[in-house]
Every structure is written in C-alpha cells, then in structure tokens.
A protein has these predicted regions:
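SF2 helicase/translocase NTPase motor core
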Residues: 2-58, 62-70, 74-196
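Hydrophobic/aliphatic anchor position in the core parallel beta-sheet
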Residues: 99, 203-206
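A short helix->loop->beta-strand "cap" motif at the edges of active sites that frequently abuts
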Residues: 197-203
C-alpha cells in the first residue's frame, strides 16, 4: 500500500486498512465509562474541532489524491464547521478557489453566515469570504442564478462545489427527471457532473 494514495478501483477492499495506517493520529480512543457516568452529559468544547472534523480536513487537503466526499454525519455533528475547516486548509495552500455553496435559502444566515464568521480563519478573512459564492437551490430561479454566477466566477481558480442537505438536492433532481416538469436542480446537477469530467481538480463535498 502506498503511503500517499490508493487505487480504489483495484484495492477498494483494503481501503479501511489504508486509512487506519495513514491516519493513525485520528483514531478515536475506546470510550471507558465509569459507573454512573453518562458521556452525553459531558460538556462540549465549542471552540475546537473534533477529531473526526480535523480528520476530514487532512483527508481532503490540497495534496490529497481524494477530492470528493459525502460527509454522512448526523444532525448537529458539525458538518458546516467541517466544510469550513476543509476550505481553511485548502486556502492555506492557495487562495485561488471558487467555493460554490449550494444551500436552501433558509440556511443562509444560520448556520452558514454564522459559522463562517466563527470558524473561518481570520487572516485574509475578506479575501477568503470573497471566494464563497452562495446559490439557493430551492429558489425558483436557481438554475439561472447558478449559471450566471458560474459564468462570472474567475475561471483561473479551482472550483469546490458544496451541497448542503444533499439528499434534498438529489431528490429535487430525481423529481425533475421523473416528472419531466422543471429542470432547476437537473441543470445544476448536469453542469457539476460535466465540469467534474472535464476538470479532474474540481472538488465536491456533499453534506
């Protein structure tokens, strides 16, 4: 097994072992409970990333062969913070990013703007923030807004597409295809798929 990469098509079965070998520092210790203690009642440190959040940042860092990930965590597990940490790490390698943040409109201010202000690195904050392009995929004009913002984005930068509540977005795509009514989500989906095929550096995070 290579220390830097693994071919999942050839060695998919040993992927868990490869992860354990190459990311040892992120292995969680066994939970040892004392009688009468409830780990759910332990105070949570809110100003520090959890081990699993930090792991994802390392797994998707700029030099990683892996560029896409479905962050399949439960509600309240910190998926938003996880994505912001990934962006912090990528930006530290190069500031040339287009972060296309596809979200329901109701999540724009909370959690996204709230967590960006809290978790995004403060150095070069304005430049980091300028790279973030918000698209509300539940807008009646989502496809038009998306294509316009893609067209206006700096083509010399690498794109990272982040889809919040990805299951909801994919359900919209399915409804577009099956009902043959409306194409908002399908247009966005097809564009991202095509860009991914044409540019191997394009990244996708599904939350």
């Amino acid at each position: 097994m290579s220390k830097t990469t693994i071919n999942l098509e050839q060695n998919g079965r040993i992927f868990p072992s490869w992860i354990m070998k190459n990311f040892k520092k992120f292995v969680l210790p066994d939970i040892i409970r004392k009688e009468g203690e409830d780990p759910c009642n332990e105070p949570v440190t809110t100003d520090k990333l959890t081990t699993y959040q930090a792991f994802i940042g390392e797994y998707l860092n700029y030099r990683s062969p892996f560029k896409d990930l479905l962050v399949y965590h439960g509600v309240g597990a910190g998926k938003t913070n996880t994505m912001i940490n990934v962006y912090n790490i990528l930006y530290n390698y190069t500031p040339k990013w287009n972060i296309f943040l596809l979200i329901p409109a109701s999540l724009h201010d909370d959690p996204w703007l709230k967590d960006i202000n809290r978790w995004m690195a403060q150095d070069d904050f304005d430049k980091r923030f300028a790279n973030i392009i918000f698209i509300h995929y539940d807008s009646p004009f989502a496809d038009r807004d998306f294509l316009e913002k893609v067209k206006k984005a700096d083509a010399s930068k690498t794109s990272l597409f982040v889809i919040e509540e990805a299951h909801r977005f994919i359900n919209n795509v399915h409804n577009n295809v099956s009902s043959k009514k409306g194409k908002r989500a399908q247009v966005i989906y097809d564009y991202i798929q095509q860009e991914k095929k044409e540019n191997s550096n394009t990244r996708i995070m599904l939350l």
